[in-house]
Amino acid sequence: MGADRDESAGPVELLIEGPKPKTQGSMRAFPFRRRDGSLGVRVTHDGGRQVEDWRLAVRLIARQQWQRPPTRGPVKLAVLIRVPRPKSHYRRSGLSAQGRRQRRPGRLAGDVDKLLRAVCDALTGIVYEDDAQVVEALVRKVWAEDRDGTWRTAIWIAPAED
């Protein structure tokens, strides 16, 4: 076992119900000239407040479930996003033909790489010290089985094997 591995760390599952997962885009830098003539740089994130709210929801659940200091070893993540189906996918008798044809959610839930970026940033400082410790990740978007319209995101965190 590696010296950085936390021997007590086993797999942990986080379940976030309710808020729609938000994608975190890239940071953008805008140069500007200050009043004194020097050059400054303003950095913004794509997504803004909505991404902050989503990351806060992930952080709150992570703090409740992760009952130990941040690990210093490699970590693997799996993220499963259950997307509520639109009402147009249903008829009285169950799924409509359109609902049966659409096997996976498309753009509705966002890009998986940007969803993962938001989750990784939210877990920094709680689960691990730096999101560079994530050495393996899987993200899936699937249709929710129930009809209650609730977004559900499950995040599994486990130490990565050397």
Roles of regions detected by a PLM:
Residues 1-162:
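Acidic, proline/glycine-enriched N-terminal capping motif
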